[in-house]
């Protein structure tokens, strides 16, 4: 009888430990697949941002639109260091550099597995101040006129604050 009474607290402690461990696991486990984030750094300031738009590459009507936009404090003296994760760099991706006059936006296309980081001056002598950076993952589609075009199926955005 004494042995049964002595093992009861041990069993109770084990059950409570298992319950606490399961509860902790439920609190810290991931909630589905994480979407990729880009990061932008300039003179001591870092921002990481998830996608503004993220579509199924096979069905461009199946989209999530969290509309996330990062903000990065910058100055004219220091460039922006943009970094993309491997999941983005493994595909063709486009960098849009948006200036004060959006008509001066530049576009640079990167081939798969060629770039993980890009250094971008915050001021261009001809275009002025850089106001934003956009990273796009591209998909080829045939438009209504039968032309083959590249369109973004995912997009990340960082606004620069002078």
From Swiss-Prot:
<dbReference type="GO" id="GO:0005886">
    <property type="term" value="C:plasma membrane"/>
</dbReference>
<dbReference type="InterPro" id="IPR024495">
    <property type="entry name" value="DUF2771"/>
</dbReference>
<protein>
    <recommendedName>
        <fullName>Uncharacterized protein Rv0875c</fullName>
    </recommendedName>
</protein>
<feature type="signal peptide">
    <location>
        <begin position="1"/>
        <end position="24"/>
    </location>
</feature>
<dbReference type="Pfam" id="PF10969">
    <property type="entry name" value="DUF2771"/>
</dbReference>
<keyword id="KW-0732">Signal</keyword>
């Amino acid at each position: 009888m004494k042995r049964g009474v002595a093992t009861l607290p041990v069993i109770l402690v084990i059950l409570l430990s298992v319950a606490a461990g399961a509860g902790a696991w439920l609190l810290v486990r991931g909630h589905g697949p994480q979407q990729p984030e880009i990061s932008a750094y300039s003179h001591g300031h870092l921002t990481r941002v998830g996608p503004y738009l993220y579509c199924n590459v096979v069905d461009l009507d199946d989209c999530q639109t969290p509309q996330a936009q990062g903000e990065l404090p910058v100055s004219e003296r220091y460039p922006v260091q943009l970094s993309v994760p491997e999941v983005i760099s493994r595909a063709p991706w486009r960098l849009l550099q948006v200036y004060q006059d959006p008509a001066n936006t530049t576009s640079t296309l990167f081939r798969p597995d060629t770039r993980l980081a890009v250094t971008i001056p915050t001021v261009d002598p001809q275009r002025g101040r850089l106001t934003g950076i956009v990273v796009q993952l591209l998909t080829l589609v045939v438009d209504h006129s039968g032309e083959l075009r590249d369109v973004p199926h995912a997009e990340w955005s960082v606004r620069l604050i002078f």
